Amino acid sequence: MTEPTGITELLLSRIRDVADYPEPGVVFKDITPLLADPGAFAALTDALAEAAGRTGATKVVGLEARGFILGAPVALRAGLGFIPVRKAGKLPGATLSQAYDLEYGSAEIEVHAEDLTAGDRVLVVDDVLATGGTAEASLELIRRAGAEVAGLAVLMELGFLGGRARLEPALAGAPLEALLTV
């Protein structure tokens, strides 16, 4: 087997397609083989940490749940603080929350009220950009906390779902970086 040469090839070679999951007709992009490969995981972490540096971020927000897996090591590698954005009801103490619409219903995310303040420049990190609903809510939450959005960085963008177009107004000029687009 030939070893992949560039980061794009390396990352793509470690993402497994799972047909008909979680429902028939869906092809799930499973990143667990990438996470299990220390070289690929380190390359991913380095690439996202470089994005944090380019944006001038002072903190990294990770979106529940796989955004935690990627965001925490990115923050550590970049020398920044890590802030988890969780589903409603998962954080103790005072929180700020943001509701957003789903295809069928709504959801809510939260952050500790004291974790983001004026002067913070925040990079949002997640595994996949699909429709952009959760990311859009996180950008609003960051701004409501008084912080500035430095950008959004994801491992993979599912371009056919239109998340980038949805996020353009919410990004307000902040960059959106996807290492892979499928």
Swiss-Prot record:
GO terms for cellular component: cytoplasm. It catalyses: AMP + diphosphate = 5-phospho-alpha-D-ribose 1-diphosphate + adenine. It is found in: Cytoplasm. Pathway: Purine metabolism; AMP biosynthesis via salvage pathway; AMP from adenine: step 1/1. One of its GO terms (molecular function) is adenine binding. It is an enzyme of class 2 (transferase). InterPro entries: Ade_phspho_trans (IPR005764), PRibTrfase_dom (IPR000836), PRTase-like (IPR029057), UPRTase/APRTase (IPR050054). It comes from the Bacteria. Its main location: cytoplasm. Its EC number is 2.4.2.7. GO terms for biological process: adenine salvage; AMP salvage; purine ribonucleoside salvage. Keywords: Cytoplasm, Glycosyltransferase, Purine salvage, Transferase. Belongs to the purine/pyrimidine phosphoribosyltransferase family. Homodimer. Catalyzes a salvage reaction resulting in the formation of AMP, that is energically less costly than de novo synthesis. This is Adenine phosphoribosyltransferase. The lineage of its organism: Bacteria, Bacillati, Actinomycetota, Actinomycetes, Kitasatosporales.
